[in-house]
Amino acid sequence: LRSRGLGDVYKRQLPYLESIRQLKWELGKNALCVHLTYVPYLAAAGELKTKPTQHSVKELQSVGIQPDILVLRAEHPLSDGLRKKVAQFCNVDDKAVVQSIDAETIYEVPILMQAQGLDSTILEKMGLPIGETPGLGPWRKFLERRHAAETKEPINIALVGKYDLQDAYKSIREALSQAGTYNDRKVEVHFVNSEKLTDENVGEALKGMAGVMIGPG
């Protein structure tokens, strides 16, 4: 659940919130509610604001849902004092407040989450045995390989599609990026609007491309 819009589209969300409440009631400790919220940074004041998170949790509590874990999405690191404040006012354990700050790539997020003990906290709350901390060796090797690939000469790939919103093709872009990692090359994806392509300009539009991919739609 995201804190953004919880009150704005409250009526539309009620059926989903009620389903979560009932599921948590039926499964008890066999279910966890992990609430992802955004902690905005006010540049003028130079501080992070936790009020939106507090209000969001209170909205959930008002419909019978108590988050077990809070993941705070922020652009800057949260101090221990700020995290403790969130834990106190949102009625969760200190160690159940995890920050998710901006990372160089999304693939670093699991490493950052593990470093804060999120995996152990989940296992503990669900009454599951906590073994040795996994080293995540294959994942770390992938990250090392990805960083190394970023230093190589790029391969240019044209992604032809009709949607201007780049996120519409995010899965394709990520797939191409991962393919580049496993081939030790940096892949640069260039979006080409299919509706603006003509017989006259297609040659220039695709000039210098090592490959062309046609997006769905």
Segments (PLM) and residue ranges:
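His/Asp/Glu-rich metal-coordinating catalytic cores
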Residues: R12-Q13, L17-R21
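Internal gly/pro-rich beta-alpha loop/helix module
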Residues: K24, A31-I130, W139-H147
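Glycine- and acidic-residue-enriched helix-capping/strand-helix junction motifs
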Residues: K49-T50, Y163-G180
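Short beta-strand segments enriched in small/hydrophobic residues
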Residues: E153-Y163
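A short, charged/proline- and glycine-enriched loop
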Residues: E150-I155, K186
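Single conserved hydrophobic/aromatic residue that forms the stacking wall/gate
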Residues: L1-Y10
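Flexible gly/pro-rich beta->alpha loop and the following alpha-helix that scaffold active-site loops
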Residues: R173, S177-G217
